[in-house]
Amino acid sequence: FHLENSHVLPAMIRKIHLAKCLNEGDWDAVRKDINLRPVEGVNGSNTDEEILEKLAKFGITPEAVTLWGTGKPMREFLWSEEMADASVHVLLNVDFKQTYDASKKNADGITEIRNCHINVGTGKEVSIREVAEKIMKEIGFKGELRWDASKPDGTLRKLTDVSKLHSLGWHHKVEIDEGIHRLYEWYLKGICINHQTV
């Protein structure tokens, strides 16, 4: 959930959560969050003005959240526990011979074992913009979503071919909306638990 170094979902969830708290004037929630994860040395003991200034540097204001790029890149998201589930499924249920085509032979008639890797994913992609909008809806932030096109988008498309995994009997179960809900609930729980011990 680091504002500079985390992956797409954690960064967007935290930014939108903080913007919602600011929008609603919930300074207690803002302070709980930044006490747990200070932002460049700024924590809950700083003044409102210092906190606002630091969060604005990361595109977080009471009125809007600004995210990098255009929001157009497409990404695939897999719930982490499902990565583990898919791995266990393959270990327990798949024989190595099922991972390659034995009918393919080289010029000497020898079976070549190639491309026997198994991609794990959902096989579904969603734009970063759509993900941000889903997060805003989940969190309940009523402010504006802005995009800073002067910042890089990164690779425009990242999608795995999961047809081999599907043919071996495993499919994901957690869709993006449910994953966002679960991750946000986990994030809030972490703030509450850690705030009680601080």
Protein language model regions, located:
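Active-site loop immediately N-terminal to the catalytic Tyr-X3-Lys motif
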Residues: 1
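C-terminal substrate-binding subdomain of Rossmann-fold SDR/epimerase-dehydratase oxidoreductases
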Residues: 12, 16-198
